[in-house]
Amino acid sequence: MATKIRLKRIGRRNRPFYRIIIIDSRKRRDGSAIEQVGWYNPIESNKEKNYVLKEDRILEWLKLGAQVTDPVNKLMKRSGLAYRWHLMKQGLSEKQIDKA
């Protein structure tokens, strides 16, 4: 099963709110998710508080082969999780990553 980490739109008209979910890549955007791993609120003016990522769960799914969509990748870059994943792919341990 090919899994993706992507955004699921919820919220009302003109007030978008997104959940960051793990989903089978063949399902529709708002289909049933395997797991919810965060949320994103683009309306929030404070860029530091407009998203939450469960970093440990996202890294676990990435290790299992899940693919990340571009919008979620941008959120991961903003939080530093994309760099952490890059270091993990190079074979560094958790202690070495924390020092970097």
Model-derived features with residue positions:
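Structured, basic alpha/beta domains of bacterial-type, RNA-associated proteins
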Residues: 2-100
